């Protein structure tokens, strides 16, 4: 048997083993074990079958982009249809026509080349609680990276007051994007005020302040923050 035929047979056996891998459903939790599907990608975990769709009465969307787009996981070759649920902070993947949540186990990236957008799953802290969440990479580099956190909030319904106000149904609305810094697989929220940002980079605050003044760069716009981070990376 020549090497080419042997490689083809090996590939077919791998595909077949993935297709027939035992998928079991726990009726109590509504979860499907798709672990073997992601062993190839180092994403070993359980994918949630239940996508929490808002009620029809809710106005708005859970998504920044509702469409499933072609993307890759950590730059692997296999392409999947995926979308980000900004209300649940979950990455949804479409498998055999059904949506699932990607497991939040090891940190990884999701690349949507068609829209030139990358999400990274990173550790972060919110209100004193350690979490894992998806962040959009604004500037890709091997050191400190600038990120944004996309969030959508559910606003509760407003009951009608007889003769005064109308009933307002619950609605989903996008919040202002928050700026984070990524370092060593952890996302850290960046302060909003110039003084606090300089203190954030305490060991290089003087150099950054001089750089910003010399180049007339502010501390509010994302394009200016990208320049500051790129300069900071040259100082390390």
PLM ranges: what are they?
Residues 170-214:
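An amphipathic alpha-helical core segment
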Residues 22-57:
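Sec-dependent signal peptide cleavage junction
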Residues 19, 107-109, 196, 207:
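Exposed alpha-helical structural elements
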Residues 1-27, 228:
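Bacterial Sec-dependent N-terminal signal peptides
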Residues 27-30, 193, 221:
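Intrinsic-disorder/low-complexity, polar/charged segments
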Residues 199-236:
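Long, compositionally biased interface segments
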Residues 62-189:
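Aromatic-patch recognition
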